[in-house]
Regions:
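Tryptophan-anchored aromatic micro-motifs
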Residues: 21-35
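Bacterial N-terminal signal peptides
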Residues: 2-12
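Central antiparallel beta-sheet cores of small beta-barrel/beta-sandwich binding domains
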Residues: 39-95
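Short beta-strand segments that buttress and anchor functional surface loops
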Residues: 27-29, 81-88, 107-113
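Edge beta-strand at a domain terminus
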Residues: 113-133
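A short, structured loop/turn motif at beta-sheet edges
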Residues: 18-21, 73-79, 97-104, 126-133
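Short, cysteine-centered beta-strand-loop-beta hairpins and adjacent loop/turn segments enriched
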Residues: 32-38, 89-93, 113-117
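Sec/Tat signal peptide C-region and signal peptidase I cleavage site
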Residues: 13-17
Length: 133
């Protein structure tokens, strides 16, 4: 289950940063799935560079937890983005969407397949200020 949650972080976060402002961001993620006793909240912080903020496919995820997941369809709007993705090694597929501004964001992702898994994530994020060492 822990690996699946890490996979969701890798999958959900790359598509969130189309025009987000660089700096220190705080994210709260709630994961739900059938059979889970209650939602599994998680939080993390990320220092996003100006380069990462410009390109949603190069932001987010954890390089120490590689994955073969890839975005297959990506649609961008002025303050929203949606995507479809697939992860060949796990047999999982998913869809997601996000709305954002320079200092905040919200997203929803649904991933299923593999061992009949149906995971849903809701993410909220806010910019805290400049990156801190």
């Amino acid at each position: 289950m822990r690996a699946l949650l890490a996979l969701l972080l890798v999958v959900a976060t790359p598509a969130l940063a189309q025009e987000m402002e660089p700096g220190e961001w705080e994210f709260q993620i709630v994961v739900t799935a059938p059979g889970m006793p209650k939602p599994q909240p998680m939080g993390y912080r990320n220092c996003m560079t100006a380069e990462q903020a410009k390109d949603p496919l190069h932001w987010g995820g954890n390089p120490s937890q590689p994955t073969d997941c890839r975005i297959t369809t990506l649609k961008k709007g002025p303050d929203a983005i949606s995507w479809k993705m697939e992860c060949p090694s796990t047999g999982m597929n998913g869809v997601g969407s996000a709305r954002f501004g320079r200092g905040s964001m919200q997203s929803e992702t649904q991933v299923g397949g593999g061992n009949s898994v149906d995971l849903r994530t809701k993410t909220t994020g806010r910019r805290l200020g400049p990156c801190t060492p």
